[in-house]
Structure formats: structure tokens, C-alpha cells
Amino acid sequence: SSKGRADLIIETKNRRLVFELKYAQNETEAKTKLTDAVEQIKARDYGNTEPKKEKLIRIATVFNADPKVRKFSQFSKV
């Protein structure tokens, strides 16, 4: 599709889990990247494809590369 696709999609019999992953150098950037990821999921309607599933779960998350953090520090269910 012209809308592209999410970074990671996991499907089970009844569920579709969609993840948009972003990378940030620090926590300030991570917050901005989370907003970007949420907007991207909504604008591109990730996961809303055929065949439909009973449950669609869409998650935006950001990996913070700061040496003191180095983990997924931001996330949001969309």
C-alpha cells in the first residue's frame, strides 16, 4: 500500500499487534520521537488491513540510546 507498513506486526488467531519503533539519543528526543511514532501510526492507519482481527493493538515505542538508559523508555498505545 502507499501508506507503507509498521516496523513490526505480530498476528495471532484473533489479534494483530502493530509496533512502530523509533530511536533517540536522549530522553528529550525520545519524547519527540514518541509523538512522531503515534502520529505515523494514525496517519498511515497501520494494522487496519484485511483480514480484520477481533482485536487490533497498536503501540508506538522509542529506544533511548543514552548510555545511562539504553532501553525502550517511551511507549504509547494508539
Residues of each region from the PLM?
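Structural signature of nuclease core domains in nucleic-acid processing machines
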Residues: 1-78
